[in-house]
Each structure stands twice: as structure tokens, then as C-alpha cells.
Amino acid sequence: MKHVRRYFLLLAIICVTGVMLTRPQVRHLAGQASESLQSYYVSARADAVNEKGFTLSYNGTLLDIENMRMSSGMNLLIPLSDVVRYFGASVTVGEKGECFVQGQYLENAAFVDERMPERIMIDMTAAAPALGLEYRWDDGARAASLDVQQNQELPGYFDLRETRALNRVENQGTFGTCWAFASTAALETVLSGDETLDFSVDHMTMNSGFNIGPAEGGDYNMALAYLASWRGPVLEENDPYGDGMTDGSLTAVKHLQEARFLDERNLEQIKAMILRYGGVESSLYMSIENAWDSSEDYAPGTASYYYAGGEKPNHDVVIIGWDDDYSRENFSHAPENNGAFLCRNSWGEEFGDGGYFYVSYEDSNLGNNSVIYTRLDETDNYDGIYQSDLLGWVGTLGYKEPSAWFSNVYTAEADEILKAVSFYAVDDHTTWELYAVPDYSGMESLAQPVYLGSGYFENGGYYTVDIPEMLSLSAGSRFAVMVRITTENSERPIAIEYPASDLTAGADLSDGEGYISYDGNQWVSAETEYGCNLCLKAFTVNKESLYE
């Protein structure tokens, strides 16, 4: 950045490794220098730590942050750009150097690195509590750690509209496009800083690849497949809603690289994710069909809804806040306890309170199936994407046990560097090991892969793992990416795409070359033996762009 402006930054967890060197030269962006000088011993210790290098782990996983440093006072300093990438929080740095983390003002927590004036450093020792993290330093091991605090207290009330501007609530009309309205709206809430974009619903519904019309419904898995494949999002102004037309040549204005599936009925987790990232997309059963409809479950006077029956969900919304003290008496038939989520609908501003309404914590469906988009990158994050699963996660494959191996083979389109790999965790508590074969010459090549790293995903979801190594790929050469995955309580831990029904009849098995294995030694073709593509993408940067 050439000028420091007020902005919010949304961050995502990445599991990689690294070593950092040299002491930083920094100055405060604003404020008076400390009156008490740091002792010579502490300053000398910081020099020694920076010269020898140290490690940082997040919840037990080593991170790769190249320009991380210790200050002369032995405080952990991390570049703001890496805080964006790795930690998942809202950070604002003002024009005068004021720093707000999760809405909390932190004095002298933002610095300019004088070796590189455009680089802003954040004091993570000071910022950790505001992020719900506990910071520790092990001097003997030269190891810093940041771990999620247990039992972090959440506020009793939160409304995302009070912390950032949201687009006006639109009306889906008679179409069954609530899923796309909810997905695009949820995505808009995780944009960084004061950035406000209006994403196209039409483009998502008409370019999803699924065999479905606008009058039919969908779900967030369809939206995720569209976003993860970089077909979108595009701007509403370039593909407006409801005109029956779309432009398939439009390119994405953001790149989605991560989404997490939240635990069923874990209300505290939903709250924590809203506070940390933005809106949570979820589903519920609506016994009304539009803003002018009525039922015993909806109280229009208080814009309150509570359904206690056994019907399955038929509508998607975005949860943007909550009120633990929201009175049970506000509902047309009272639940047992107070408390409700604040939800954004897609029935226009005529519905509820300007398009928003409260749903009781005790609603039968809300919170059972929820997703949050946790890493939304700029479009220059990578140069290339290699994939064969345009419909995303349709089913699962495995060997009736938690572990399995899977690999996809691609052909490099240019002289490139392999920078990242993405795949799904089909359930919570997933560990993984990542490998690659840079010069693939046949199935036997899979027996000698290059180890790239390992990590852990607490939640099911779609994840991108960045690769610190400079793994070179030659134009026209074939390469393979490989994952050993272990998911607790799963007998089929591999996410696959296949023509399971009319909805997914468009799955193209001719564009993929995937292999699965029980032990990493004996491999079989996913397409030939199982009639599926593997959900395993690769991302590259062009070699020439590294030196521009």
C-alpha cells in the first residue's frame, strides 16, 4: 500500500511452515515514544532471536510468514498483509495510525517497517487478546505460538449492519433463487475494509453448471462449486437480475479460496464466525412465501419468525447478528426461551424490518446446515487454476475407514510454479498430508512424491493450502498433486464429482485424470473404476511474473 487508509481486513487460516530472519527497523505510525527504554538485555535477546530465526504456530500448525520479526521489546510483529492471510479477523488502521482489532482500540499496535515503508506491521502480542488468541513465547525453543482461547466470551448482542455497510435487500420475486441471493449476500459481508460490491445472482444461477432452472431451488453446495471454480462472482451491473440473460464470458472479480461448514445447531460457533468473518448462510423452513403472506409462525409487527415443526428447510437466508435477550413474547407463538438470530432475507425491503427479521434460537432448522466464506482473495492471487470438478462436492469415496489417498494429474500450460492446492474436508477434524510429483510419467510416478506439508482442519469445508516451496513446472509437462486425508467418523473422506442425478448430469468425466489409493502405493483410476472426478485443484503462478 502506498498510502495508509482506513480499511477492514478479513483473514483466513493457512497451514504451512517457515523461518524468519533479521531484526526489524520500525517506527510508530502515531503516538509518543515509550517513556521507559527497553533494557539492553531484552534488545540483545531480540537481536539474537531474529538472527537465528524462530517459528510461529497457530493452534499447533506451523505458519510460513517470511517477514515476521521480534521488536526490541520482544513483541511479535507480523506484516499486516500476512495477518490478513492467516488469522481471520477484522483489523482497521486509520490515517493517523490508530489501530482497531475486532473493534477494540489498541494503542501503538501498528508500525511502519522503515526498511520497506509500504509495509505495515501489527504487534500480535498486543492484538492476540482482541482476536481471542493466547500468545506464548518459548525462549529455549525459539518458538512463538498463538492459540484460540477456550471459552471466549461472546457479546449478548451483535448486528453486522452496525460495523459495516451492507447492500440493500433485493427481491427474488417468483424465482427459486434464494440460495444464490443468500450466497452472494453472505459473500459480500466478508469483503475487506470498507469495500462494497454487489455480486450477480443471475450469473451464479445461470452459470452454475447444474441442470436447474431459475424457478427451481438450490443450495450452498452449488454456490460453492461455482465460486471455487472461479466462474464467479461477477458484478450485478454486468449481469443484472431477472432479465433471463447472462454473459458466460464474464470473469470473476474475486477468488474464493475457503469456506467452512459449521457444526449443526452450534449457536455459539455461528456467533463467533459472524463476529470474526461476516454473515453465515443457513437454511430454514418458511411457512410463508413472500412479504405479503401470513402464517401462525410469523409475527409481522415485530418481524419475528419461529417454526417448531418437522418440515425440511425450503429457504436460505444470511445470519448477520443475534440478540440473546430478544423476548420470546415477540413471536406469534412463544418458544421456551428468549434469544434470536437476526437474518437477512431476499424478499425485498417490504418484508420484515427493511428486509431483515428475527428467528428464534429454537427454530427447528436454522443453524442445522450453515456455511461461511472465510477466504476471499483478489484475482491476482494466482495465475492459473487446474481443475476437473466444476460441480464440486457431489458425493464421497473411500475405503470404509477414515483415511485414503487421492491424486489428480494435470498438464502445465506454461513455465509455472506450483503455489497451492485445494480440496474438501467432508467432516470435522480432518488431518492431511500434501505431496506433488512435478514430473509425472505414469502411475508408477505416484510412488515417489515430494512432501509439501501437513495440517489440520477443525471444520468441514473447502480449503486452499498454500505451498512455501518453489516447485517448478515446465510448459507441457505433466504433474500430479496428491493428498493423504484422514477425517474422523468418516468412511469415505474423499469428495468427488459425478453424474449422480439429473441435477449433476453435466459432470464431465473426460476432463480429469484422478487416482485413489488405500495405502499410497497401489492406485486405481477414479474415472475408470468409479466413474467420478476428484475434487482436488492446483493453483500456479507464471515464472515470468515472479520477476516483473
Where are these regions (language model features)?
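Short, surface-exposed beta-strand/loop patches at domain edges
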Residues: 484-548
